[in-house]
């Protein structure tokens, strides 16, 4: 059903890839041999944390008397009282447990299970689904690029829209949790802290700040990943399949968007991953090792993505069997091969809804009904020839990743112009926003327009008359 093919990589000078605190040295890929590109533009993470619980179905309601400004909150804030946390002692009461990456956690699966027993109303069993926490972030200081902060705001809104529609919690971080682990390493301390703060979440979904969710109907196929603990966009044939005569590539997978299970395996994995980062006394040596291992790596630093590929390549790797390399759909897709096709994708989706017998797809509905209506549209894709994803298909790309564009710093990959990045982001953001605005009866006046216009009744059938 899903198919994708890799496209090639362009070398990015390290000096163009390093923002003061947030950038990544990922190679950005024009269409040639390795598919999606790899910049990490999001990192900077948590001290000051904005936790967006927009339409969060998992947040318990406060008692009626606590929803007013003058309410007595004594019962809710009994200092140091286990009763305030549900009446049973949990791992949160252990002073030895730390949120920081320099202090390993053991027995995490049992700790999570104990917490779930103490809070059955918040457990996965109570929800009936595996809960997902999306984590993203940007630097704590204002952007250096004119308009960069506004672009980050739109990118944040895009993630908040998707999470609201699908009942996913969103954690957006704007400060470093560990000053030594900045730029592309900053996400590891954030994810570690998020796992501890959200034991109810089965999965943590890291999404770089420069990634746009461009299919608001698509839901993560979590059943596909049973038996795995880490899902990244990549190709097994490229990660593992290089022969002695072919060079390994650090761009054979993308570490800018991934799913990681909230479990002990993942904590151990991140400890091993971080051991190749700037906190390690072997950091310089790891940079040399990784540069030697990957002929297409042009900078000397040890980065998260090269380290991840290297970990998977080692003989007897304890990690490989639990890592799912997703290439069946645009888990994250290279923006240069996507943005020019968005207009044609819109036309094909509208044509699908104008087909005989498709009136139910056009029917107006409340935003709260998004999931069943999205499922109906997804079910109709095959009949309209839109089921195939990737560069050869016309299904909406799930995630469009603007690697190399650096919207905050403005230090773009030298192969891109500011106009191409800015216009591409506006197209992708408006493309996604139109899917959201439809429930409100509007759409953008054009793919690059900030203006909106009302939709006629029975759109898009009425629009063609």
Language model segments and positions:
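N-terminal anchoring/stem segment of glycosyltransferases
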Residues: 2-4, 8-12, 16-17, 23-202, ...
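Catalytic core and acceptor-binding pocket of nucleotide-sugar-dependent glycosyltransferases
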Residues: 40, 186-189, 193, 265-463
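Beta-strand cores of modular interaction/reader domains in eukaryotic scaffold and signaling proteins
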Residues: 98, 133-136, 164, 169-171, ...
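Aromatic-acidic/polar surface patches that form glycan- and anion
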Residues: 127, 148, 152, 180-184, ...
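Surface-exposed beta-strand-to-loop junctions
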Residues: 133-136, 166-173, 247-252, 270, ...
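Short coil/turn segments at secondary-structure boundaries
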Residues: 146-153, 175, 217-220, 270-273, ...
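Short amphipathic alpha-helices and their capping/turn residues within compact interaction modules
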Residues: 164, 168, 196-200, 218, ...
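GT-A fold catalytic core of metal-dependent nucleotide-sugar glycosyltransferases
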Residues: 177-178, 183-267
């Amino acid at each position: 059903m899903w198919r994708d093919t890799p496209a090639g990589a362009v070398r990015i000078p390290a000096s163009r890839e390093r923002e003061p605190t947030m950038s990544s040295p990922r190679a950005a890929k024009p269409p040639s041999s390795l598919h999606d590109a790899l910049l990490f533009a999001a990192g900077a993470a948590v001290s000051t944390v904005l936790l967006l619980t927009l339409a969060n179905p998992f947040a318990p309601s406060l008692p009626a008397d606590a929803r007013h400004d003058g309410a007595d909150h004594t019962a809710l804030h009994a200092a140091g009282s286990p009763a305030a946390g549900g009446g049973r002692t949990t791992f949160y009461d252990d002073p030895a447990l730390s949120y920081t990456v320099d202090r390993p956690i053991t027995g995490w699966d049992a700790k999570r299970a104990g917490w779930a027993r103490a809070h059955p109303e918040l457990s996965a069993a109570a929800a009936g689904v595996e809960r997902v926490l999306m984590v993203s972030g940007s630097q704590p200081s204002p952007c250096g690029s004119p308009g960069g902060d506004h672009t980050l705001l739109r990118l944040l809104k895009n993630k908040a829209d998707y999470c609201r529609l699908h009942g996913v919690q969103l954690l957006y971080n704007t400060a470093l949790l560990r000053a030594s682990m900045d730029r592309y390493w900053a996400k590891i301390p954030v994810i570690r802290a998020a796992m501890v703060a959200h034991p109810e979440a089965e999965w943590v979904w890291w999404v770089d700040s420069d990634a746009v969710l461009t299919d608001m109907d698509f839901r993560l196929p979590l059943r596909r990943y049973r038996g795995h603990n880490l899902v990244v966009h990549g190709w097994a044939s490229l990660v593992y399949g290089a022969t002695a005569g072919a060079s390994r590539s650090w761009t054979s997978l993308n570490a800018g968007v991934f799913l990681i299970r909230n479990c002990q395996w993942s904590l151990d994995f991140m400890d091993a991953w971080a051991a190749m980062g700037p906190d390690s006394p072997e950091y310089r040596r790891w940079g040399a090792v990784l540069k030697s291992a990957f002929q297409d790596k042009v900078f000397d630093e040890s980065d998260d993505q090269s380290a991840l590929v290297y970990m998977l390549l080692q003989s007897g790797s304890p990690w490989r069997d639990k890592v799912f390399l997703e290439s069946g759909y645009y888990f994250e897709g290279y923006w240069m091969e996507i943005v020019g096709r968005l207009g044609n994708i819109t036309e094909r989706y509208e044509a699908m809804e104008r087909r005989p017998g498709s009136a139910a797809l056009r029917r107006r509905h409340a935003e709260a009904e998004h999931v069943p209506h999205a499922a109906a549209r997804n079910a109709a894709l095959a009949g309209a020839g839109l089921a195939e994803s990737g560069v050869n298909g016309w299904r909406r790309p799930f995630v469009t990743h603007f690697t190399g564009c650096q919207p905050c710093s403005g230090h773009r990959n030298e192969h891109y112009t500011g106009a191409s990045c800015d216009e591409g982001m506006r197209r992708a953001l408006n493309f996604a926003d139109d899917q959201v605005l439809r429930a409100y009866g509007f759409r953008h006046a054009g793919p690059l327009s900030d203006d909106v216009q009302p939709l006629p009744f029975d759109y898009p059938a009425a629009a063609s008359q």
